[in-house]
Amino acid sequence: MHKIYHNSIAAEHKSEEHNMSKYKHIDDFIKIPQLNNKDQLFHYTSAAGIKGITGGEFWVTESRFLNDSTEFTIGTDICIEILEKHMRNSRRFLYAKDLLMEQMRKYYREEQEDTVSGSAEGSYVISFCTSGDSLLMWSEYSDFMGYCMEFKYGKLKETFQEHCGNDSTLFDGKVIYDHDEQTELLEDTIERLLLSDGEDYKTIHGWDDLDSAEEEDVKLFVDHISVICLLYNMFFKKECFAQEQEYRMVFLCVHKREHQVPENSIPVEYRIKDEVFIPFIRMKLGDISCLKFVCVGTKNISDLAVKGLRHYFGSRNLEVRVKKSEIPLRY
């Protein structure tokens, strides 16, 4: 799957900033918004998290072990809705749906480990926020007692890319929560990528042709759609999470290829949380100068919290400013 992702939008990291809008996009077809290099990005964490990150690494959790149980599935569900909307032949729709579901199961099964080929891959997610002093985020991630780290997006992404290696790929973008927007993005991408010229198919040149198209063409069409689903699945979430204002970085890593561990591959490790083994990777942060501010949680009222953090940064010669949350909570 890593190869499929990589080949589908290989020019992602070369996209240029657009001065006339807040966001650029992954590329001309995958319309996931991206920040511009001078923008800020925020990460809510604990004191231990700050120590680890400023020590030079993020612990990045495997996507299937995140808090949202529907991670990496929303794009697939919406794609099925789109197919159902355009296909009047119920038997042909069920055929296409079954093909898509099987293809997606195959992709994500191979992410764990393919026992035949001996390959293993994984998708790992760091969640950031576009809001730097969010009441919801303080509550959800630190019980109002943690810290919010402010990064320069461009520098942060650059240092991650420098440490990705040949067997990992970084994708990043703003999470999309609105169902109508998700549907429009996915439908538009399918139409522009797969239906604009129809050169790949003998009998499919538009949505109306799906009901009568040859099965071979339907299968090829669904195979192509599945790659689009893989990409959008990374950045689609349910609307109930919209207040998180998430911006995420997704690392696609090959841990093993045909029973061989690639040189410089990133190993999987495991931490224990609530008696559960959680797979993660250590992603190196070579240049900590991308960290500009740390905000102390709104209920962390001890003056020692600010003093201790400033003392810590000073001892490590880090030019990071410390400030208190402006949210006036008492208890």
Please tell me what each predicted stretch does.
Residues H2-Y331:
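Partner-binding and oligomerization surfaces adjacent to conserved cores of proteins
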